[in-house]
């Protein structure tokens, strides 16, 4: 998920890291800065830093989207019209032979486990798809639901434009740039 103002750069360079030679000099951040710092320094089981990876959620309507839109945790609110989901797939990342890890919950939560390409054949049993697809994550009968809803897929390094299958935004009016339609209309706002 990214700010709509980052899309022109993504269309030219793919999704890039701040340390990439192709990094967006005009990057517009969204999200909790303190969490981003924590993630950047979090060491994965394979010895790499989580900050070296590009994050994806498995579902929409995530707690992060809620925080970004509503401005909690010292995060400035960003309107739904300015938020874009960059969509890829596990299969596409595998086909492009990109290195990745995935988690069964929020990546920096101590209860979450990390998995690699060696575990991918079991992804359907590892992930809790009911929690991932749930509209609400607060559940008095399941206090771990929010963590599982935030299961993540992390791709190492920059992601080329070829790995991006589409874009989802709340906007009803799609835009064209360089003769490519770059947003699909879909309502996933809170």
Which role fits each region the language model picked out?
Residues 1-190:
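Active-site-proximal loop/hinge segments that shape catalytic or ion-binding/gating pockets
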């Amino acid at each position: 998920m990214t700010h709509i103002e980052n899309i022109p750069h993504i269309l030219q360079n793919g999704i890039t890291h701040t340390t990439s030679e192709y990094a967006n000099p005009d990057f517009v951040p969204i999200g909790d800065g303190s969490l981003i710092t924590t993630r950047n320094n979090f060491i994965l089981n394979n010895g790499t830093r989580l900050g070296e990876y590009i994050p994806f959620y498995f579902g929409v309507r995530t707690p992060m989207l809620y925080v970004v839109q509503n401005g909690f945790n010292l995060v400035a609110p960003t309107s739904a019209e300015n938020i874009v989901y960059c969509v890829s797939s596990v299969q596409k990342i595998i086909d492009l032979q990109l290195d990745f890890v995935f988690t069964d919950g929020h990546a920096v939560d101590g209860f979450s486990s990390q998995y690699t390409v060696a575990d991918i054949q079991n992804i359907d049993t590892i992930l809790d798809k009911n929690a991932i697809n749930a509209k609400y994550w607060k559940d008095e009968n399941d206090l771990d639901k929010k963590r599982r809803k935030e299961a993540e897929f992390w791709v190492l390094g920059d992601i080329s434009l070829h790995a991006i299958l589409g874009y989802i935004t709340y906007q009803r009016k799609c835009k064209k740039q360089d003769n490519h339609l770059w947003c699909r209309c879909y309502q996933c706002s809170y």
